[in-house]
Amino acid sequence: MQSTYSREQYISLCKDIEEDDYRYYVLHNPTISDYDYDMKMRQLLSIEAQHPEWKVLWSPSMRLGDRTSGSFPIVAHAHPMLSIANAYTLEELYEFFSRIEKTLGYTPKYTLEIKIDGIAVAIRYEQRVLVQALSRGNGRKGEDITANIRTIRSLPLRLSKEAPEFLEVRGEVFFSRATFCQINAAQRQAEKPEFANPRNAAGGTLKLLSAKEAAQRNLEISIYGSLAEENKRSHYENLLLCKEWGFPVFGQPRQCQTIEKVVASLHEIEVARAQLPMEIDGVVIKVDDIEDQKVLGMTAKHYRWALAYKYAPERAETILEDIIVQVGRTGVLTPVAKLRPVVLSGSRVSRASLYNEDEIERKDIRIGDTVYVEKGGEIIPQVVGVCLEKRPEGTQPWVMPEYCPVCHQKVTRESDKVSVRCTNSLCSAGVIEKIRFFCGRDALDIDHLGEKVVTKLFDLGCIHRRCDIFQITEEDLRQVPGFKDKSIRNVLKSIEKAKSVPLDRFITALGIPYVGIGGANALAQHFLSLESVMAASLDDLKAIEGIGDKVAESIVAYFHQPEHLEEIQKMLSLGVHILPCHRASSSCLGKAFVITGTLEKLTRSEAETYIRNCGGKVGSSVSKNTDYLVVGQDPGSKLKRAQELGVPILSEDELLKLLY
């Protein structure tokens, strides 16, 4: 069909929608209705479908995400993209000021910017059109995430004539608190793992292979720096320039003439922190004068002219209404706090972790208390303390029940006197948790078999134990509410795929008490086959580094229970094929690793798995026995400790080279 539009009209329509996007997403002052906007966008897509040769790189349709990629190419940064050192106390902050004054010979002006808890990116414009976006990576090279960055509505795809022709901006990609809550609600609805925090969600979204899927999540960005010949000498003035060029700059950057003003501003921002629409974990303090920045220079990893002052985790005060006891897959009873709902870090919190009975006793937590709740990097908040001044009269110390809250059989207390366990192998709570864990991401990784679906199949009588997973039929799945043909096909396909499982994952999936991912990997590396693991004696097991008496006894006891042996044999008869382990022979064999900071290419869990698969060990703290510290973005105190001990430090890229 012949188009009734000219190319000039097409370009004019692009400009109109571009202006609408700027008013809506940057100025938050729309001038047309959502309906009118949608009609314009439909018109644009129709024209581009008829005339694909007209489509420009800055077309608003580029934000819809039309690329699916199998990878993210690694590209060198034109300018190093280093991280910023952290300070957690005023003492560390004054040490930073002292170093600056000692080098410069005077007290400079400082610019303060809120430290949004997101993902740093570099975005390049040529002829004022967005042509490339890279992740931070190792600071020297990053991944090309251009397609996903284009989906950010507040980011201009084309700059006005007032902006430089060639420009690179640095920014933080993030989710607002409200959007993050919506994303996790969608994850729960789909029975997928929730994101621990907005930063993880943003990082995961930028790594989505489908830009169309990324576009649906509504990422945002705040620009914190620019590289252009037209830049002024003041960093603060350059941020104002970025705003004039159409970039979003959140948080009203401040210019401070004195150190006293800097410190006062830090306190003011902390007070206002909870009211911000996005998560922040501190304030970035930068020497304002660009020439001073050049004098101060940089280390291999950090700029010497900037510091991130980190705030303590956000805390909320609320009432502990009850303590609920949950039963896990190994039968361990875990107390969970039921709270009077309170808003914390932008989300509504009604439950919090209490860990165990000893922790409750140590903190003297009682039902009816006013408690303090914090949410760090975890999904579930924690009760960190009690306001004793507000304790009501008549409260009683809490004690663990003597009977399982699900099957009502008497519980047993472990020799460590911390763990209380329901030993009834038929307890429905424990059975459902075992099946759910068996299907989970760290085990067989069977898609769409989350807690709700597993519970429904159990209640329907379709499954009674783990081996029944491999006998699930199409008729069984049709009884699950919401399951249609496509979902059913996907589940059955995923179950079939899970029948071929590496030895370490199968051992993990069994859920042997005290045997986690690391222990399962150690067993697989040592014995190479399931038969050898099952036949191992106590002495055989104790000879493996990292397997102590308690773990060895648990493994032997597990494989001496007839019902466990029978279930494993049933799985094998149903076509489960356990892939033998090939002993690692890399330079990682036997080496002890510790990881600090946020990795760009791998999740923490993936990095730990790769290290273990190559025969290495992963620890949680740095000591003289640590062979390597792997450092990601925003490393913690472990880096300082490693430097003091002379522990070799690896970047993420160096780790990958060592592994492969």
UniProtKB/Swiss-Prot annotation:
Q: Which residues form the active site?
A: 115
User: Is Translocase tagged as a keyword?
Assistant: no
User: What GO terms describe the biological role, i.e. biological process, of this protein?
Assistant: DNA repair; DNA replication
Q: Which Pfam families match?
A: BRCT, DNA_ligase_aden, DNA_ligase_OB, DNA_ligase_ZBD, HHH_2
Which reaction(s) does its UniProt entry say it catalyses? NAD(+) + (deoxyribonucleotide)n-3'-hydroxyl + 5'-phospho-(deoxyribonucleotide)m = (deoxyribonucleotide)n+m + AMP + beta-nicotinamide D-nucleotide
Instruction: Recall the GO molecular function terms of this protein's record.
Output: DNA binding; DNA ligase (NAD+) activity; metal ion binding
Q: Which InterPro entries does this entry report, sorted A to Z?
A: BRCT_dom, BRCT_dom_sf, DisA/LigA_HHH, DNA_ligase, DNA_ligase_AS, DNA_ligase_CS, DNAligase_adenylation, DNAligase_N
Domain BRCT span(s) in chain numbering: 583-660
Q: Keywords on this record?
A: DNA damage, DNA repair, DNA replication, Ligase, Magnesium, Manganese, Metal-binding, NAD, Zinc
Annotated positions binding NAD(+): 34-38, 83-84, 113, 136, 172, 286, 310
Positions with a binding annotation for Zn(2+): 404, 407, 422, 427
The top EC class, named as a word, is ligase
Q: Does the keyword rRNA processing apply?
A: no
Q: Name one GO cellular component term.
A: cytosol
Cofactor(s) needed for function: Mg(2+); Mn(2+)
Q: Which cysteine residues pair off into disulfide bonds?
A: none
E.C. designation(s): 6.5.1.2
Which PROSITE patterns does UniProt cross-reference here? BRCT (PS50172), DNA_LIGASE_N1 (PS01055), DNA_LIGASE_N2 (PS01056)
Mind telling me which Gene3D superfamilies this protein's record contains?
5' to 3' exonuclease, C-terminal subdomain, 6.20.10.30, BRCT domain, DNA ligase/mRNA capping enzyme, Helix hairpin bin, Nucleic acid-binding proteins
Instruction: Enumerate the HAMAP family for this protein.
Output: DNA_ligase_A
Concerning NCBIfam families, the annotation shows: dnlj, PRK07956.1
Function text: DNA ligase that catalyzes the formation of phosphodiester linkages between 5'-phosphoryl and 3'-hydroxyl groups in double-stranded DNA using NAD as a coenzyme and as the energy source for the reaction. It is essential for DNA replication and repair of damaged DNA.
Q: What is this protein called?
A: DNA ligase
